[in-house]
Amino acid sequence: MAKKVTGYLKLQVPAGAANPSPPIGPALGQRGLNIMEFCKAFNAQTQKEEKNTPIPVVITIYADRSFTFEMKTPPMSYFLKQAAKIQSGSKAPGRDKAGKVTKAQVREIAEKKMKDLNCDSIESAMKMVEGSARSMGLEVAG
């Protein structure tokens, strides 16, 4: 028989930098999970990733206080900031432009994010990426 799921926990953890300090420690500790077990497993799975890349993770918590976790791709804003070579988006996205991304960069980001997006075609994924870019104050060129 399958284990009984008691809850889910969503966190965004830097790759290779999971440690028991806040926010990870308290979030897992409140639910009675082994914090160090998660940290070691997460850091082992994110060794290939670039250091400090934010990795969204969904932790499934079971009744016997065991857990499994699924890692997602980094947030779209992370990829867009890398592509535009900026530190942060525009403070006033409708008026001020923070930078530019090309259609080729948008396609590349859409291909990376495809498995986490709720769409079927690369074109619809590109539209989602373009929308995120505009909301950050980035201009989509080409």
From Swiss-Prot:
InterPro entries for this protein: Ribosomal_uL11 (IPR000911), Ribosomal_uL11_bac-typ (IPR006519), Ribosomal_uL11_C (IPR020783), Ribosomal_uL11_C_sf (IPR036769), Ribosomal_uL11_CS (IPR020785), Ribosomal_uL11_N (IPR020784), Ribosomal_uL11_N_sf (IPR036796)
Tree of life domain: Bacteria
GO BP terms, alphabetized: translation
Keywords from the named record: Methylation, Ribonucleoprotein, Ribosomal protein, RNA-binding, rRNA-binding
GO function term, MF aspect, one: structural constituent of ribosome
Pfam families, per database record: Ribosomal_L11, Ribosomal_L11_N
A cellular-component GO term for this protein: cytosolic large ribosomal subunit
Post-translational modification remark: One or more lysine residues are methylated.
Entry annotated with the keyword ATP-binding: no
Subunit structure: Part of the ribosomal stalk of the 50S ribosomal subunit. Interacts with L10 and the large rRNA to form the base of the stalk. L10 forms an elongated spine to which L12 dimers bind in a sequential fashion forming a multimeric L10(L12)X complex.
Described purpose of this protein according to its UniProt entry: Forms part of the ribosomal stalk which helps the ribosome interact with GTP-bound translation factors.
HAMAP family (UniProt xref): Ribosomal_uL11
Similarity comment text for this entry: Belongs to the universal ribosomal protein uL11 family.
Protein name per Swiss-Prot or TrEMBL: Large ribosomal subunit protein uL11
Annotated source species: Bradyrhizobium sp. (strain BTAi1 / ATCC BAA-1182)
